[in-house]
Design a protein with these regions (language model features):
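Short, surface-exposed interaction loops/tails
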Residues: 36-39, 54, 71, 95-139
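Extracellular/periplasmic head regions of type IV pilus-like filament subunits
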Residues: 58-108
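Conserved hydrophobic/amphipathic alpha-helical signal-anchor segments
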Residues: 33-75
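N-terminal single-pass transmembrane signal-anchor helix
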Residues: 2-30
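Non-catalytic, surface-exposed connector residues within folded enzymatic/regulatory domains
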Residues: 24, 40, 64-67, 82, ...
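Generic leucine side-chain signal with a strong bias for well-ordered alpha-helical environments
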Residues: 9-12, 21-22, 53, 73, ...
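A residue-level signal for beta-strand positions that form part of recognition/binding surfaces
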Residues: 6, 85, 111
Length: 139
């Protein structure tokens, strides 16, 4: 009797084909992760900004106006009861390097509109290019 402990050429080719098929299925999911990580970071940063806005409202009695913008969370826009240490250390930018958009009074949100334009830096978009909005269920 012959002892066959080695793979035949056919068995090796079948394994290589299966690995190739698995790679084509798995790779798109792996390659998309960096963009998903950026979107998740934007969501977390929007939540942090919302917390700073809530503290500002507690101290000052109102949210910053659109003209004061998010800069009001970094330096006093000339209001009473401003707590310099309680808000943000620096003006945030989204993971794509663009400023977050803040509007108060809001157009779509309940108290204010806060959003990132996403990967394409343009209004609207779908999937990776969609806007990340504080009033959206994604957050």
């Amino acid at each position: 009797m012959k002892n066959n402990n080695a793979f035949t050429l056919l068995e090796l080719m079948i394994v290589i084909v299966i690995m190739g098929l698995l790679a084509t299925i798995v790779m798109p999911g792996i390659m998309n992760r960096p963009e998903q990580a950026r979107r998740t970071k934007a969501i977390v940063e929007i939540r942090q900004i919302e917390s700073a806005l809530a503290l500002f409202k507690t101290d000052v009695g109102r949210y910053p106006t659109t003209s004061e913008g998010l800069a009001a969370l970094v330096s006093n826009p000339g209001v009473k009861n401003y707590n310099q240490d309680a808000y943000l250390d620096k003006l945030p930018t989204d993971p794509w390097g663009n400023p977050y958009i803040y509007i108060c009074p809001p157009i779509k949100g309940k108290y204010y509109d806060l959003k990132s334009l996403g990967k394409d830096s343009e209004e609207g978009g779908t999937e990776d290019n969609s806007d990340i909005e504080s009033w959206n269920n994604e957050i």
